[in-house]
Amino acid sequence: MLLRYQDQTNDFCLVRVQNGIKETYVIYQDALFAFVQIYEDPSAMQDSLRDCDFTSNDTAKELWTSSCGFDINWSYRCNINRNFGYDDSSPCLVLTLNRIFGWLPESASGVQVCCDGATPNDRDLIGTLCFYDALVHDEDGCDRRCGTFPHQYYPYLNQDSYQPPAVFLEVRYPKKNVLIRIQCWLDNMPNTQQVEFAILID
């Protein structure tokens, strides 16, 4: 699993923000802005993209020649107009899966990515974790501990204009002035590596 929000040079990532000082978090905003551009580029909206029925557990034959579109508005509060939450100390991050040619999820419900504080103390300080994705993209995203990469986006076969599914993670109002460690993992895929990062809002 790949955690997307900045150039990652090691296995542990720190998001550090000084509240109200944009220079301290513009690097994260810029990285997220660049990420969402692949979904907003009109040239990407070709005949090979289609609207998908995410309530169906059946693998459609068309998946092998086309791919599902991903509506960037599904990011809900994690959007450009809100500067991805960094202005009000509720930073957003993006979780994606690496593209593996021909791979299919074992579960017909897709792949779940779950996140929580790394320790009980972190869980007390973390505030609220909200997951916005193709299935849930409103306040209900704050009532769960996992987001979903729907199975309809797989397999990846180098389709034209393929748009990988994303899960937008909002860390809503975490405790300030303390380092908070967060772990994310794939819930229904054993033997996959966890992603760990930390947030510090001064």
What residues fall within each predicted segment?
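An almost-null, non-specific background feature
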Residues: 37, 48, 77-79, 102-106, ...
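Surface-exposed coil/turn segments at beta-strand junctions on protein surfaces, enriched
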Residues: 88, 162, 175-177
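Glycine-rich, often proline-containing surface loops adjacent to acidic residues and nearby aromatics
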Residues: 91, 163-166
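Eukaryotic intrinsically disordered and solvent-exposed regulatory patches
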Residues: 78-82, 153-155, 168-170
